[in-house]
């Protein structure tokens, strides 16, 4: 049995801690969804809409008002006037401190369907805000995936640039020694120095790009990237064709569902605008207690009332008709916004699908290019040992290998991110990544978009 030394144990413990602290792609996306301000703003918008529903439902409940008053009142009426014994009239006036109190209960019996339609409108707004919160979470998730993959890609490019520079430094040192001994030419030395400077510049550029990628990562995820796990490819989760992806987009994309809910809300607003054309009927129950009013000292007008009241507007200068027509135009506006959203999403889906297809076609050739360049470099090194290649030939092979590996790295990550873009446009990104949504992103009822492009009929 092998016994671990303290140093070996410490190294293994450090490696275990590093692996334990490595952030996965799902963890990064979940962190962004949980903390990003854009999603929190959408959540508060949904919570506000929930309160609007409660406000609208208040129209079904009775209204109770208490009115109380205190003041000084001067009266000149039949209560203060009297006839003198000689038959003459005495116009006496009384100034008294009075108190008034009234308690009134009013219950709506019929309001032209205003309350029920307003409740339906606010509930449609709740669905719109919920689906918009989903859409915002999906956009943030896609952005989180983009910055996550970008950091991984930039780190690989920094490694490639570092290896390329080290190779140039080794060859440059050898050419310098040959030049000092009079074996090599100054032209070879200058050319080697120029290529080494270019390799240094490539490394500086790669390091700056990595710093930018890490800054973007912090902005989206809310923390700096330390150890990141390389995610497993999602090729197996892609639809078979663009047509299948488009159909999934129509059924699942939350932006379309939010836009459709806005159309539903506009239609209910139109129904609300019809209520002024109906009479309103209320049940009224009231009681009052007054003191020192109308010139009478003491309690008077202590009465109660129970009945129904009907009010019906006959003319309002055409305002109600104008509002109805305005809300009709708002329905058309909401439908146009929904249809435009479909066109934009369909375009984004096609572009992401094309990018994925293009990168998928280029990946095998880019890999072949990188593998071939690796073999060429090895062959050049062997031939250099036999005197068949120069040091500049070795630099050529190093540059070719660097460009090939960089191209292969870029194509791989482009293909991977394009697949995530396709899932996002389909509305399946959060589900495929098993991301938990906040409760404010859950709609009260399912909404199916009625938007269609001409070629989808």
State the predicted function of each range.
Residues 18-69, 75, 108-109, 185, ...:
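Bacterial Sec-pathway N-terminal export signals of envelope proteins
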Residues 407-457:
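Acidic, low-complexity, intrinsically disordered peripheral segments
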Residues 40, 63-83, 90-95, 106-135, ...:
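Small/polar (Gly/Ser/Thr/Ala-rich) solvent-exposed segments
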Residues 1-21:
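Gram-negative bacterial Sec-dependent N-terminal signal peptides
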Residues 102-104, 148, 307-309, 353:
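Membrane-embedded beta-strand positions in outer-membrane beta-barrel channels/transporters
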Residues 23, 139-250, 352-355, 359, ...:
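Periplasmic alpha-helical coiled-coil/stalk elements that build and connect Gram-negative outer-membrane
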Residues 41-56, 136, 140-159, 170, ...:
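Amphipathic alpha-helical coiled-coil segments
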């Amino acid at each position: 049995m092998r016994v671990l030394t303290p140093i070996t144990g410490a190294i293994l413990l450090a490696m275990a801690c590093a692996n334990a602290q490595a952030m996965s792609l799902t963890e990064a996306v979940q962190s962004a969804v949980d903390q990003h301000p854009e999603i929190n703003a959408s959540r508060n918008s949904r919570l506000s809409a929930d309160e609007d529903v409660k406000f609208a439902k208040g129209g079904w409940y009775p209204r109770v008002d208490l009115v109380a008053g205190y003041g000084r009142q001067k009266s000149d009426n039949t209560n203060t006037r009297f006839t003198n014994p000689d038959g003459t009239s005495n116009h006496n006036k009384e100034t008294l401190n009075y108190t008034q109190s009234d308690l009134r209960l009013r219950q709506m019996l019929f309001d032209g369907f205003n309350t029920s339609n307003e409740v339906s409108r606010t509930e449609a707004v709740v669905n719109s805000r919920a689906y918009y919160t989903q859409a915002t979470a999906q956009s943030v998730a896609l952005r989180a995936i983009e910055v996550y993959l970008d950091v991984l890609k930039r780190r690989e490019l920094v490694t490639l640039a570092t290896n390329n520079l080290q190779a140039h430094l080794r060859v440059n040192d050898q050419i310098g020694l040959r030049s000092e001994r009079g074996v090599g030419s100054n032209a070879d030395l200058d050319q080697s120095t120029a290529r080494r400077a270019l390799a240094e510049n490539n490394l500086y550029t790669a390091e700056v790009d990595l710093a930018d990628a890490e800054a973007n990562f912090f902005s989206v995820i809310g923390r700096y990237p330390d150890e990141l796990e390389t995610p497993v490819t999602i090729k197996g989760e892609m639809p078979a064709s663009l047509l299948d992806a488009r159909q999934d987009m129509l059924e699942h994309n939350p932006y379309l569902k939010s836009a459709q809910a806005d159309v539903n809300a506009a239609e209910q607003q139109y129904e609300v605008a019809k209520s002024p054309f109906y009479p309103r009927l209320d049940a009224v129950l009231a009681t009052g207690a007054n003191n020192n009013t109308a010139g009478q000292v003491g309690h008077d007008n202590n009465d109660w009332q129970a009945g129904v009241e009907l009010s019906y507007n006959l003319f309002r200068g055409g305002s109600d008709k104008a509002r109805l027509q305005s809300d009709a135009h708002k329905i058309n506006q909401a439908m146009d916004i929904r249809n435009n959203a479909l066109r934009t999403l369909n375009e984004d889906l096609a572009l992401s699908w094309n990018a994925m297809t293009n990168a998928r076609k280029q990946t095998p050739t880019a890999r072949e290019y990188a593998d071939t360049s690796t073999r060429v470099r090895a062959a050049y090194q062997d031939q250099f040992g036999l005197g068949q290649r120069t040091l500049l030939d070795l630099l050529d092979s190093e540059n070719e290998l660097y460009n090939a590996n960089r191209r292969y790295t870029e194509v791989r990550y482009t293909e991977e991110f394009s697949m995530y873009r396709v899932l996002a446009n389909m509305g399946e990104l959060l589900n495929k990544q098993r991301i938990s949504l906040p409760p404010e992103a859950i709609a009260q009822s399912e909404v199916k978009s009625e938007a269609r492009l001409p070629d989808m009929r």
